[in-house]
């Protein structure tokens, strides 16, 4: 599951439908990607990061890896 993305989406009060529309995909398709059943395409990750004005790694890298990378 994309926990960082889910948390960010909820903090910014966006729905799955909002992000599906942003990516020009179905809400069900987006939901499956957020659940980790399908992978986000590279361009979709960049679109989402740009939309939220966040670093792509902060959204899509696993939290453990992101923390380890910051301390290096």
Predicted regions and their residues:
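Short basic helix-loop element that most often maps to the first helix and adjoining turn
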Residues: 3-22
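DNA major-groove recognition helix of helix-turn-helix
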Residues: 34, 44, 52
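Short, basic-rich loop-to-helix N-cap that marks the start of a DNA-contacting helix
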Residues: 37-47
């Amino acid at each position: 599951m994309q926990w960082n993305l889910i948390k960010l989406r909820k903090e910014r009060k966006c729905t799955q439908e909002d992000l599906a529309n942003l990516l020009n995909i179905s809400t069900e398709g987006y939901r499956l990607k957020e659940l980790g059943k399908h992978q986000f395409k590279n361009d979709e990750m960049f679109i989402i990061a740009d939309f939220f004005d966040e670093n792509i790694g902060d959204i899509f890298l696993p939290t453990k890896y992101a923390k380890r990378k910051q301390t290096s």
